[in-house]
Amino acid sequence: FPSNVYCWSERAAQCGAEIVTIPIPADHDWTAAVLAAIDETVAVAALPHNHWTDGSLLDLEAIGAALRAVGAKLVLDITQSIGAMPIDVAKVKPDFLVAACYKWMLGPYSLGFLYVAPEFQEGEPLEYNWITRAGAEDFSALVDYADDYQPGARRYDMGERANFSLMPMAIAALEQLLDWGIADIQMTLAARTADIAGKCESLGLMPLPQSLRAGHFLGLRREGGLPKGLLETLLAEGIYISVRGSSLRVTPHLFNNDADVDKLVAALKKIL
């Protein structure tokens, strides 16, 4: 996603590093393409769990192991998957893992989550706010300015983290996701997208093989490209999907049902 490009481009310019972008593999096997690019010249790999345009899946356990073998670091933005697809941090072993709270986390805008590996939990934060300083919980002593930070990853918190509007929404979303179960969400959505993919293939809309994409994500491509006005026509039918790159991105959730799928397919038949 662009957010995971711009920040690294800026950092590379500051420190004289080179950004290497892996082009879309012809076979759409991103894992093999990433593994082939890893060598001793790599310092950091900034990756998702699945691609934001079509759901192309990456084997993060294999990639993480390959990076550690050459002394490189793994930074993950899993906004496109967290909340809908399981990830085992103990096996992947990312150095940093970030995710926005909205999208599959079902939370509000303006919040995000950050995991920091133990070896980086004593680093210097990007934001110099007061609440991340040592002893900030003692309001009576705030006049005694502190140079040290809160222990561990707490030092990386944003300012105004005690947001009385956003935090309750985020907590409610997390509780709902845990109640449903992430593995069950993935299994249910994988069945739903497989059904959509099968019905759309006869319309000339081609999905990635199920083995190469995340179960909750479907990107449909068409030879010759998607027709102009596609989204506007679907919107007029009350159907909300998006185009990302050359893919018609279809990402249903648990609230979508068979009738929604039938409505989508019927509308696509009229357009295509």
Q: Language-model features: where?
A:
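Pyridoxal 5′-phosphate
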Residues: 1-272
